[in-house]
């Protein structure tokens, strides 16, 4: 009988169900007469404590690239690739490096050859490069161009005048260094401020291939032998900037050996106030090291970044490196400022060209493939050219803690 009752329960009249299930009375949260229970309101949470003041840390991701050495096959292919307003299109040369540059706030390069919009292009031994090359580098992300090297005087006074006009026509966010409009210009230190960090740029060269400055030149280089002038400039830059970056065109061509003159000048530059020293000219890789300046600062020196792009013909000349560092400025709560060069890494690059020095372009080693090595035009003379050979050259010349292959 009980089972029947349960199954029939849903059919009972509505009033029967309502009377059978008592309704709960709401609990009052109001105070009642003495002896009644009182429910208190929740207390408001205490405000979170103010965070402790922290030092201000400002950083710049900085890269430096070696010799942009434009031989005839490079500008001739650029002419064939051109369309639209430009007479030459060099973008193909740099398109594989542009994503890497985009990861940095500042990209510096040694512009080994004169760039102009006026002179006819020419190759070794006296170079002249279409201005469209520099514009392509600008599009790729380069903003700082070092102009002091052994080819600066290749076209004499007319070349200096033309290149000054060219660099005066490019966007204002470009910084050039290494050409000075006479002694009265030596006190004008190129400066750049990025992310609240001010960087000074100076560049010097060991020689100009025996071509002297003449009185009709509108600008001149400063030679590494002019140590009094260099000392004054570096010390002046030290007072103006958080970081002093010095490019030096020095050393022995096609030699991986750092000579005593390079080491001595690097130490002097560090003692005078340089924070980062970038070496170019040998066309091949040389090692890098930390130097301790007279005031205790740690100064990073890359003695040679090798070639960035060229159509030279030996494997060593086709393997360069891009330096990547972090420039960090820390302002303490008491106003004290500390500046440090951090995490230097040298990333190998490979200049690739096909048979007949065609289709010249540059890759980071980490993006280069064995298939590309097998199609490289250099294999005609060096059939063993391979990823293993490239790694071997890089490892033989760069300390392992500084080398980044992947």
Where are these regions (language model features)?
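Acidic, metal/ion-coordinating pockets
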Residues: 5, 9-26, 35, 39-406
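N-terminal Sec-pathway targeting helices
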Residues: 1-3
